[in-house]
Amino acid sequence: MNKNMLVRSARPTLASIHRLFSAAAAATVDTATAPVVKPRSGGGKGGESANKKETVVGGRDTLGGRLLSLVYTKRSAVVTIRKWKEEGHSVRKYELNRIVRELRKIKRYKHALEICEWMVVQEDIKLQAGDYAVHLDLISKIRGLNSAEKFFEDMPDQMRGHAACTSLLHSYVQNKLSDKAEALFEKMGECGFLKSCLPYNHMLSMYISRGQFEKVPVLIKELKIRTSPDIVTYNLWLTAFASGNDVEGAEKVYLKAKEEKLNPDWVTYSVLTNLYAKTDNVEKARLALKEMEKLVSKKNRVAYASLISLHANLGDKDGVNLTWKKVKSSFKKMNDAEYLSMISAVVKLGEFEQAKGLYDEWESVSGTGDARIPNLILAEYMNRDEVLLGEKFYERIVEKGINPSYSTWEILTWAYLKRKDMEKVLDCFGKAIDSVKKWTVNVRLVKGACKELEEQGNVKGAEKLMTLLQKAGYVNTQLYNSLLRTYAKAGEMALIVEERMAKDNVELDEETKELIRLTSQMRVTEISSTIS
């Protein structure tokens, strides 16, 4: 059975495998999506302006300049290309490929996809396997995995090879669908498609993000048998050791990379700096950070945000400010990731006035509405118990048209919980849950709210919290016991608790039975009657 037939036979499996994470799109032709391991520096929407080009380059008008200057997603890349052709200019495939690559680097995926789709319908443009791989990756990002899988299914047989499979694997990893990723990875091995380290890097990235560190050495051993690791492989391996604060293991990996004649990049030293800082190896951290600084340049702009964060972790105010000054002198406009890391850094260093000044600057120049940035200021107000100022700042956020995120509501919930204002706690907590499609349980917050409601004997509040948690799909025996303890504190009878628990598929334990017995001897109130 040939490779294409083998992949075809995997279609039912692929259709049931779903998403994934890594960065594979153009496996062999484009490394822009290769997984990069770096400390969490805030990410952000600011990438739009990161490498923005002028329409006129070197005194001449270019198609790339026009497309890169679109910025707003509502504007059409196809219209721009058509107009270019109508003006008598030629359009070359290699030029469009380069533009797509640039757009992907600055996260302008919609315009990149429009260009790919335009190329598909041009009879004079011959597409290669790598083009389909990039196209699939962009579909996954813009339209979702189902559309990407259908695109893969409809792809010409000869294009459904190593590059396309690696791109699909990337999508599965990004969407954290490990079963689908593992099934596809196994099928790629059977087809002989594991001929580069990129698919392995995607799988390593997934296992590390899931905390499955035991799978890392096994996969690297297999990788070395089939192909050669690159510096990204070693950075991922390094990250696995760093996640467990294993300095000795990380240093061995670093030395192995050097032995393999692989040049460490800024990510390598970023991971090492972060590890050394976490484990109080301050001098080693500073040395690693100096090595990282040597490798940071305009070409890898994303590194600056990481650099700022690492200086802050080491308590280096001068390093933070000097890096920020360098960024501002290197680029016309700062992006959200840079503002996020800088504001976070100065807050960490106790420079709240500077942080507020930076926020004012961001607010005046950015139109992204990225709630993560005002959340830093809001959280610091609340941490300082300056609740009234925090509330005024929240009003300012809303007036500016910034939509509160889940984190915004969670910050407010914690602040009001600290003040024991349970009415506002429950209001903000409900809005937090409503702001996300699927709520990830914050156990500490739930326990804190339950404890305060119990201490207050706040039956009405406890019942409202139970309703919110039922709506979010999070109900258990401990929550019902907390509710019963609240009734007991208030001296009130809790009615039909056993029936309610049965309806929620929650089992009674010994404490539940004792609390039901205890509260059954108490008075029936308006709340009790309403619930029954």
Swiss-Prot record:
One of its GO terms (molecular function) is mRNA binding. Pfam families: PPR (PF01535), PPR_2 (PF13041). The keyword Mitochondrion applies. PPR repeats lie at residues 161-195, 196-226, 230-264, 265-295, 300-330, 335-365, 370-404, 405-435, 442-472, 476-512. It is found in: Mitochondrion. Residues 35-56 are annotated as: Disordered. InterPro entries: Pentatricopeptide_rpt, TPR-like_helical_dom_sf. Keywords: Mitochondrion, Repeat, Transit peptide. Gene3D superfamilies: Tetratricopeptide repeat domain (1.25.40.10). Residues 1-28 form a transit peptide. One of its GO terms (cellular component) is mitochondrion. It comes from the Eukaryota. Belongs to the PPR family. P subfamily. This is Pentatricopeptide repeat-containing protein At4g02820, mitochondrial. It comes from Arabidopsis thaliana (Mouse-ear cress).
